[in-house]
A protein has these predicted regions:
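Glycine-enriched, solvent-exposed interface loops adjoining structured elements
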Residues: 1-219
């Protein structure tokens, strides 16, 4: 469905939400917000082949929002993650790195085996000792603006099945605006259940994130 069709379907199924209650202009603004929210929750917009980051000797961190257009997060599900020299490296926490070696911050440069995140930054567990190999990051992306009469979710045809999520989003927002007892909670529950199902169908619920269990109990 294109944007106008989504709004028409919403009004058809919610006749009490007239234009006096919710103007088309306000609904279109909500749809743009909903497009961003749904993509963020379901992580449905991902890059195709990952982004190659050219490395230099002694590099130990990178600004991912600078290196990757519309970067939202690292895609940590199977087929994603971060690789160095085409080998996957582990995501860790600073606490895990401290547990493994209290002197990791001062270790000599070499081949990174892991990384940790700080917001938009990715930090390697050691600085790189050569510019011979590249880092590759597979990312979840921020969707394109949904401000025209086109399909949502970057107009990706394989996501057309899930356009109904935006009808549930409009319904949730409208019921919250009206404030009828019981209806607001029901609309919120329906929206949440749909997104949970959508994420599962897209893969986030079928596969778990890749982690490696260590003998010391840390992952």
């Amino acid at each position: 469905m294109i944007r106008s069709e989504i709004l028409s379907k919403f009004r058809e199924e919610n006749p009490e939400i007239t234009d006096r209650v919710l103007t088309d202009a306000a609904a279109y603004s909500w749809l743009e917000e909903g497009n961003r929210e749904i993509c963020a929750i379901t992580r449905c917009i991902v890059d195709q082949d990952g982004t190659t980051i050219t490395t230099a000797e002694d590099d130990d961190h990178y600004d991912l929002s600078d290196k990757i257009s519309k970067f939202a997060d690292i895609d940590t599900y199977p087929g994603g993650g971060v690789t160095y020299n085409d080998k996957r490296i582990e995501e860790k926490t600073i606490a895990q790195l401290d547990h493994e070696s209290s002197s990791w911050r001062s270790r000599s440069s070499g081949t990174p085996k892991g990384y940790y995140r700080r917001g938009k930054w990715i930090y390697l567990d050691r600085s790189i000792d050569s510019n011979e190999y590249d880092l590759k990051v597979y990312a979840v992306l921020i969707p394109d603006d949904f401000n025209d009469d086109v399909m949502p979710f970057n107009e990706l045809e394989y996501l057309e099945t899930y356009h109904y999520a935006l009808i549930y989003y409009l319904q949730k927002r409208a019921k919250m605006k009206i404030g009828k007892t019981g209806e607001e909670a029901k609309a919120l529950q329906e929206y949440g259940s749909y997104l949970k199902w959508m994420k599962k169908e897209l893969g986030g619920g079928k596969y778990t994130e890749i982690n490696y269990t260590k003998h010391n109990g840390y992952k």
